[in-house]
């Protein structure tokens, strides 16, 4: 459960991401594909090379979903319901992949905003992406 301080930290951190969200989403995906090659199996139709327009496009989708989650931080299950349905019923993504992408996103944010990535902010963002992952996997049951 996100505390009021966590919510403040998440919103402040995401505000600093600003217009770079899509780029960071793509970078996190590239990081995931390189670090965890089995995740590529969900994207057989993608050009997974560095700078690929398909990876950039999906990175923007990831970032947009996170922006939605930040904007509806008190009601993420409702805000992400359609996305949860998509991943559970159509795409059938293994839930462990959300954790892998979450880790890669945190690394990406830490690389781009090292001064802002304090232990407290790191903990808050980790709890946030874990909450998003929980919401996205909630329809698997």
From Swiss-Prot:
Transmembrane segments: none annotated. Keywords: Acetylation, Heme, Iron, Metal-binding, Oxygen transport, Phosphoprotein, Transport. Coiled coil: none annotated. Residues 1-141 form the Globin domain. InterPro entries: Globin (IPR000971), Globin-like_sf (IPR009050), Globin/Proto (IPR012292), Hemoglobin_a-typ (IPR002338), Hemoglobin_oxygen_transport (IPR050056), Hemoglobin_pi (IPR002339). It comes from the Eukaryota. One of its GO terms (biological process) is hydrogen peroxide catabolic process. The modification Phosphothreonine is found at residues 8, 108, 134, 137. Red blood cells. Involved in oxygen transport from the lung to the various peripheral tissues. This is Hemoglobin subunit alpha. It comes from Cephalopachus bancanus.
């Amino acid at each position: 459960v996100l505390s009021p301080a966590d919510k403040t930290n998440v919103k402040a951190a995401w505000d600093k991401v600003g217009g770079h969200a899509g780029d960071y989403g793509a970078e996190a995906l590239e990081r995931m594909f390189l670090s965890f090659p089995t995740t590529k199996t969900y994207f057989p139709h993608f050009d997974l090379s560095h700078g690929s327009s398909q990876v950039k496009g999906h990175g923007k989708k990831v970032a947009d979903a996170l922006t939605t989650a930040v904007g509806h931080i008190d009601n993420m299950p409702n805000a992400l319901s359609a996305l949860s349905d998509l991943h559970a019923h159509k795409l059938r993504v293994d839930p462990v992949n959300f954790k892998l992408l979450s880790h890669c996103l945190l690394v990406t944010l830490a690389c781009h905003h090292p001064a802002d990535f304090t232990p407290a902010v790191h903990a808050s963002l980790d709890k946030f992406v874990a909450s998003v992952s929980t919401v996205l996997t909630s329809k698997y049951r």
